[in-house]
């Protein structure tokens, strides 16, 4: 059934725009250039406003998810990476549940990736229609069918650009993946902005700067009571404070520390005697994939809940899914869940919120740990990183594990890889929860993603440099 499904969508995949694989080896300097161009296009799209919108000043229903999904409200990057990640989530769940079967052949892998891209484009259209029809840019009846269609086309073209930029990097023209690059850029930009933002906000305490560090110097300069000024800089509510900044740095350090945890399995060449090596199985075996997929799941749940709340306010089942409230305290207007399933799947705002509603905190912890472990375990089956796939790769390289025959390698790898995937997913979820409870800037999920992505790029740079043999190749 699975192969038939992939064969059915094959004609549709053939007409999709595609980036061709490079016919030659792309040099490191070229990869850096293409990565910079990709990032530049993304950042430009983040600043170009959508043409035709009447208003985007209403409460932002996806404020909490924008950092993670690399989206920017009212611009071409309104959807961010949400369509790509959502399509990946759907295809992974279908493959993990054996509803579709993905073989080991390059043909099946290519069809699977094509199906993911096709679903990504369909989801882009669907999300664009939902955003417009729910009144995010103004009343659709007042805007008219022409303007509504124009906004949908803009969002679709922008979504297609993101898909192709991601594919450009994944095909080997650049470094890493577009998804990772866009997420890390967005999160780091948010952290820097929250620390140094010169924007002023009117609060009950008077006019204050949004940036935590700028606010520290401003409070020390304007307050006569310096001790009180310091206390306010560390603990002020509804705006970034120094405690949030310290928590962010602490979480960065903890995640980098855990990145070094791994088990090295001894392997040796079956062809050449005396040639030994190790195969590392990291604690974060699936890296940040579990947290990305978990974010996609929650964001789509938010979209559905917001849409239903707008159309069927007061309905019991809709309220069971989620009830929402608007706030503009200490920043832009935003909507946040105050009841229903969406409330329990959203992180507590602070450690004080944990004490106020421990049931909410407990359900959130269980959801984060369980979903990250589940996505981590299922991801290895569809991404070519399971014990069977690794054993096949070692066999192709004519490498065997010390003290084991080729036939027993899969059994030995099965002792480590599924455990590393599940436990690594649990750790990722646990660290994300810890960062949320500490009040880290950019959310716990965002910090986890930023650190793991930056570490991935560090490893890519080290690998490229080792292949070139010297640091000199970094310079023109």
From Swiss-Prot:
| Lumenal-side positions | 54-76, 139-144, 194-240, 310-354, 442-445
Q: Which InterPro entries match?
A: SecY/SEC61-alpha, SecY_CS, SecY_dom_sf, Translocon_Sec61/SecY_plug_dom
Which Pfam families does the record match to this protein?
Plug_translocon, SecY
Give compartment(s).
Answer: Endoplasmic reticulum membrane
Q: Which GO terms describe its biological process?
A: pronephric nephron development; protein targeting to ER; protein transport
What are the transmembrane regions? 34-53, 77-96, 118-138, 145-165, 173-193, 241-261, 289-309, 355-375, 421-441, 446-462
**According to Swiss-Prot or TrEMBL, what is its membrane topology?**
Multi-pass membrane protein
Any idea which UniProt keywords this protein has?
Answer: Developmental protein, Endoplasmic reticulum, Membrane, Protein transport, Translocation, Transmembrane, Transmembrane helix, Transport
Write down any Gene Ontology CC term. endoplasmic reticulum membrane
Which residues lie toward the Cytoplasmic compartment? Answer: 2-33, 97-117, 166-172, 262-288, 376-420, 463-476
Give the residue range of the signal peptide: none
Task: Tell me the function of this protein.
Answer: Component of SEC61 channel-forming translocon complex that mediates transport of signal peptide-containing precursor polypeptides across the endoplasmic reticulum (ER). Forms a ribosome receptor and a gated pore in the ER membrane, both functions required for cotranslational translocation of nascent polypeptides. May cooperate with auxiliary protein SEC62, SEC63 and HSPA5/BiP to enable post-translational transport of small presecretory proteins.
* Quaternary structure and partners: The SEC61 channel-forming translocon complex consists of channel-forming core components SEC61A1, SEC61B and SEC61G and different auxiliary components such as SEC62 and SEC63. The SEC61 channel associates with the multi-pass translocon (MPT) complex.
Family recorded in the similarity comment? Belongs to the SecY/SEC61-alpha family.
UniProt name for this protein? Protein transport protein Sec61 subunit alpha isoform A
